Amino acid sequence: GLLSNYEHIPLNHPLSVTVPGAVAGWRELSNKFGNIPIEDILDIGINLCHEGFKISKELFNSLNNHSEELSGQSSGYSFYRDNQPYSIDTLIRRPQLGKTLELLKEHGLEYFYNGEIAKEISNSVNGLLTKDDLSSYKAIWREPLHQKIYGYDGWTSPPSTQGYLTLSTLKGFEIINNKDDYLHTLIESYRIFASDRDNITYDYQGNDQK
């Protein structure tokens, strides 16, 4: 099989891609909590894509830090020129993304998983995501993780996300008594709880170590 050529799943490769879940999540959220038509919500994104938005300092820093991975992608032209990110306050437009949102507005959110968009997604990863992979995808409601931290309620998403790292690290702060130990404790607490990430959360549903 394809994976036999690799000791680990390559990071920037179609083998590392899973079915995009955001659109299915929008549908669930809209159906359960929404009182604004999804078409009106999509209009906001469509207008932003075509009218443009300015690059903030935070976005610029992120684009700069990840330019090696992002600048060569097909959508990278919106944010990069000659492999360098556009400067802060540059007006950016995303016409291709706007067109995608327009198709979802016209055909419904399910078009993302069953229509031409699904075919393009499959083709972009050399068929490693199949038609059935996409059409059968469903967003799942899960109980959030909860932890009391300094008397406050902390909530985050459960595995297979890495939200547990945030709660576990913050909980570790409660044992800090010496300000000089703050940074060391911050680093070590994160390292400890991150150590199980690749062994457990990568396939949480199929892993018994929960």
Predicted feature locations:
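Generic recognition of short, well-ordered alpha-helical interface segments
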Residues: 21-24, 164, 184, 188
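M16/insulysin-pitrilysin zinc metalloprotease superfamily fold
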Residues: 163-177
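Short helix-capping/linker segments at secondary-structure and domain boundaries
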Residues: 31-36, 106-109, 173-179, 198-201
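Generic recognition of well-ordered alpha-helical segments
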Residues: 25, 100, 168, 172, ...
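Noncatalytic scaffold domains of N-terminal-nucleophile
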Residues: 1-161
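Internal maturation/activation junctions in enzymes
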Residues: 177-210
